[in-house]
Amino acid sequence: MITNVSIKNYKSVVDVSLPLGRFNLLIGANGCGKSNILEGIAMGAAASSDKLDYEYFANRGIRVVDPRFMLPAFDDIKSDRISIGFTNGDNSLATFDIFYNKDTKPAHWQDESVSADSFVAYVGENLSLHGRMVKDMIERINKMKSNKNNSQLQNLRLKPIEDDVRIMTVDADLNRFLIYSLEETILRKADDSNRTYPLGRHGEGLFAYLKELSQKTEGEEIFNEIKENLKVLDWFDDMQVPSGQLSMEFNLKLKDSYLAETLNTFDQRSTNEGFLYLLFYLTLVISDETPKFFAIENIDTAFNPKLCREVMKMLIALAKKHDKQIIATTHNPAILDGLDLSDNEQKLMVVQRSVDGYTKVRTLNNKDIVKSDLPLSQLWLRGFIGGLPNNF
């Protein structure tokens, strides 16, 4: 798991260090730089994959603009280099120094960092399968070492190998980093027009992927876990993928517990948007084919305030269970009430602009919270933790 991200000279983010946990929530006023932070991480992920091109940017959630606007536009900042660094515990995974090379035809973004870290990143991407094989081998050897009869294995040192495998695995997760920003019109479409398998950043491919899961033996457990968690919605009774669909048909059969037996099923075209958003997030977190490390913009969209709290608790628990790492943004105070800041794996970060306009980040913990019986949502609304406009 990535434990820290440093971003320098990306748009309004001049110099920010972001300590990460399992679930990380960014709050702040409109225009404070929350999306810029997410894009900076995506920029580093693009560099780690050696895919610094505009098509890749768009598919990963980076807003494609004139290269001049990818760099800070402050009078006192003259750097033409974007620097993105990633850390896993005590290990520096990689640091990428990215610049726009105008001397080539066509001009393009380029990573000029050549280091052992970036080499490890390359190895991690291309040998992730071997990494898993070595990891399995290490586990088996450790079991053999525990047997005192295997005296020849007692002094075998595996720690350096274990560290390398861990770095390779984490870096492979970084390469798939994606910023999800759902759109109802796209989410509701029943097609498979998706450039990022299995789920697109706006909601593409959801029904095609659920159909695929329903047709695989190993997908049944995932499908059932998704259904079980959908029961947080009081009306939800069941969800099935109808048999006999044509290859290009992608429909769901949903059952409402309140409706009469003669008319209690319908497809996704008739359901509410909150259900669709929740279905997508559950699929994203539970599936083992989706990215391990990703971001969600405006995670509160389409949810009732009370549901926001329960969805947060649910997604955090599922992220721990399925080894996912999530960064989310919100403007809805109710989302904060699903956080438990006594858990070090849950982070609340306040994003704001400095007097010079730079984006800065402050991580809150229990010691920073005013002693009060008020929930976090009310502490935010009343201005005790920041993250609000201060010009009115």
Indicate where each model-derived feature is located:
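Short loop/turn elements that form and flank the Walker-type P-loop nucleotide-binding site
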Residues: M1, V14, P19-G21, E289-T290, ...
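Pre-Walker A-like glycine/lysine-rich segment at the N-terminus of P-loop NTPase domains
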Residues: M1-V64
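Catalytic acidic motif of RecA-like/P-loop NTPases
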Residues: K11, N24, N272, D300-F303, ...
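Well-ordered beta-strand positions in beta-sheet-rich domains
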Residues: D15-L20, L93-D97, T265-D267, K360
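Conserved P-loop NTP-binding catalytic core
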Residues: E39-T104
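C-terminal lobe/lid and adjacent interdomain/linker elements of RecA-like ASCE P-loop ATPase modules
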Residues: Y56, R60, A73-F74, E310-F392
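Electropositive, glycine-dotted interaction segments
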Residues: R81-V241
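Conserved ABC ATPase signature
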Residues: K231, W235-K306
